């Protein structure tokens, strides 16, 4: 089995959520970060968090990596994760505001198409670059785009010749389709609370 780490790209303050740090928002009485780590720990032997402030993560026992370039968005987080995990074959990079990750989807991202430079879901034709696996050998491409100010993740996936997980595959791995539900607005937070209340 290939050696694959997982990295939470924590991101900066969320302007539309009052400047909150998204992974520390509570859903169903539990921080999003703790929900994510509970799902990730049984699947990945190495976990990283790319974050500007290491303090909230120390108590969670996670290796914290600083962004390589500040103000460059999630591409800088992916670059930092690949650099920190140079002893691995790949890194599954995840946005820090995904509270309902499917273990089956994460396992598929770890294991499938190990030769691919990138493996990413594409539900309804829409790529999900922050719930995707990137080969460590793709770091040169990532860094060249970062250094050149070409920060769009969808363009990165196109350049890498990504292997895609299509709708049929995703329906089997994540029947509820909630893995890509993220937190951008107060309405998203309210809906997430409703989903958490309904969860078994």
Q: Which sequence ranges carry the predicted segments?
A:
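Conserved active-site and cofactor/substrate-binding residues in soluble primary-metabolism enzymes
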Residues: 187
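Nucleotide and nucleotide-moiety/phosphate-recognizing core
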Residues: 1-179, 190, 194-197
